[in-house]
């Protein structure tokens, strides 16, 4: 008697057991854990590269401005007091606004009226205030998580209300002391830095050498970032006004604390990018030699660290390796 066989039954495939499935899931999890940091590092490397390119474009724009006008732009314009408006809150355009044409933002430059209208006058007109809130990509580091509008850098005035300006990730280098700017305004003393109110620094004024002088550095949202348009009244608000688009090297890179909004810092691990006066961009380690213990007011040639020396253009001191 013949035995009937079922070919279909013989072809039934064996499935995964629960243990095998768990092993496969574990292998996939391990691969993800190994690959994810590499992917994140690659993305951050791309962001750092874009940040560096942004600063290179800013450097080229600053030098093109110098080529056209014989000086670098002012850190900010010292606005004329308008007593018919009020006696405080005089906002002034900053270095970022002055180089808009060199950054292919000529239309925005003309709409703002940078050459013929003071910023505080523009802010009086409600219809024109949104111009200060336009984000310019070259002023934004892709690692910086800042929102489009910087609500930590607000133009405050009873006459035109509160206006939050567009965020920037870069600040002009104002040396190592805010008071150098006020010293210059009062006594016309040289503040030793690249940017200050009404500054007109020429390349020949950078006697320490353009390759040894910071011009622009990073400012991260974790410490309130910056704005590109300019500053609010720095005479009434002191350094709180100037630090809107300028920074000083009196505190360490990426150092948290109450003084951080005055300093330089980035979202990159280990340091921050700086644009030098010769146009090159270099990543400066947060462990760079730092010493501000003997920064005697009125005597910028006193003993300072390498970091502080790089923030001054004509202190006459040799700069060590960094």
Feature map (PLM): residue ranges:
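Generic alpha-helix initiation/capping and coil-helix boundary signal
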Residues: 1, 19-22, 35, 158-161, ...
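Amphipathic, alpha-helical segments enriched in basic
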Residues: 6, 26, 30-33, 37-40, ...
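Residue-level detector of intrinsically disordered, flexible termini
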Residues: 2, 7-11, 25, 37, ...
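N-terminal single-pass transmembrane signal-anchor helix
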Residues: 12-47, 57
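Internal low-complexity, small-residue/proline-rich segments
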Residues: 41-322
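N-terminal leader/signal peptides at the extreme start of proteins
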Residues: 1-18, 79-82
